[in-house]
UniProtKB/Swiss-Prot annotation:
<feature type="topological domain" description="Virion surface">
    <location>
        <begin position="1"/>
        <end position="22"/>
    </location>
</feature>
<protein>
    <recommendedName>
        <fullName>Matrix protein 2</fullName>
    </recommendedName>
</protein>
<keyword id="KW-0813">Transport</keyword>
<feature type="site" description="Seems to be involved in pH gating">
    <location>
        <position position="41"/>
    </location>
</feature>
<dbReference type="GO" id="GO:0140321">
    <property type="term" value="P:symbiont-mediated suppression of host autophagy"/>
</dbReference>
<keyword id="KW-0945">Host-virus interaction</keyword>
<keyword id="KW-0449">Lipoprotein</keyword>
<keyword id="KW-1083">Inhibition of host autophagy by virus</keyword>
<keyword id="KW-1133">Transmembrane helix</keyword>
<comment type="similarity">
    <text>Belongs to the influenza viruses matrix protein M2 family.</text>
</comment>
<keyword id="KW-0472">Membrane</keyword>
<keyword id="KW-0946">Virion</keyword>
<dbReference type="GO" id="GO:0044694">
    <property type="term" value="P:symbiont genome entry into host cell via pore formation in plasma membrane"/>
</dbReference>
<keyword id="KW-0812">Transmembrane</keyword>
<feature type="modified residue" description="Phosphoserine; by host">
    <location>
        <position position="64"/>
    </location>
</feature>
<comment type="function">
    <text>Forms a proton-selective ion channel that is necessary for the efficient release of the viral genome during virus entry. After attaching to the cell surface, the virion enters the cell by endocytosis. Acidification of the endosome triggers M2 ion channel activity.</text>
</comment>
<feature type="modified residue" description="Phosphoserine; by host">
    <location>
        <position position="93"/>
    </location>
</feature>
C-alpha cells in the first residue's frame, strides 16, 4: 500500500498506521524522487539568478580581450558593472561593436 493512501485507525486506544511494509521498491523510489525534487526546488529558489544566467548564456565569459588596450578593458568593465547596477532585477547584456 502506498504511503499516500495509508489509513490511520485507532488501535488499542492509540493512533497507528495500518500499512504494508514500507520497504516496497515503489515507495522507496517515490520517496527518493520526492526528496530530490524538494532539494532541487529549494536550490532553484536560492540561486535562481545564477541558474537562469547560466542556462541563458552558458559558460561564455564574454568577448576576448586579447589585443585590446587596458584602458578599453577598464571602460568595458565599468559599462558592464553600471548596466548590472542600473537594473538589478533583469539581466542586461551589452555587446561591443
Amino acid at each position: 500500500m502506498s504511503l499516500l493512501t495509508e489509513v490511520e485507525t485507532p488501535i488499542r486506544n492509540e493512533w497507528g498506521c495500518r500499512c504494508n511494509d514500507s520497504s516496497d521498491p515503489l515507495v522507496v523510489a517515490a520517496s527518493i524522487i520526492g526528496i530530490l525534487h524538494l532539494i532541487l526546488w529549494i536550490l532553484d529558489r536560492l540561486f535562481f539568478k545564477c541558474n537562469y544566467r547560466f542556462f541563458k548564456h552558458g559558460l561564455k565569459r564574454g568577448p576576448s580581450t586579447e589585443g585590446v588596450p587596458e584602458s578599453m578593458r577598464e571602460e568595458y568593465r565599468k559599462e558592464q558593472q553600471s548596466a548590472v547596477d542600473a537594473d538589478d532585477s533583469h539581466f542586461v547584456s551589452i555587446e561591443l561593436e
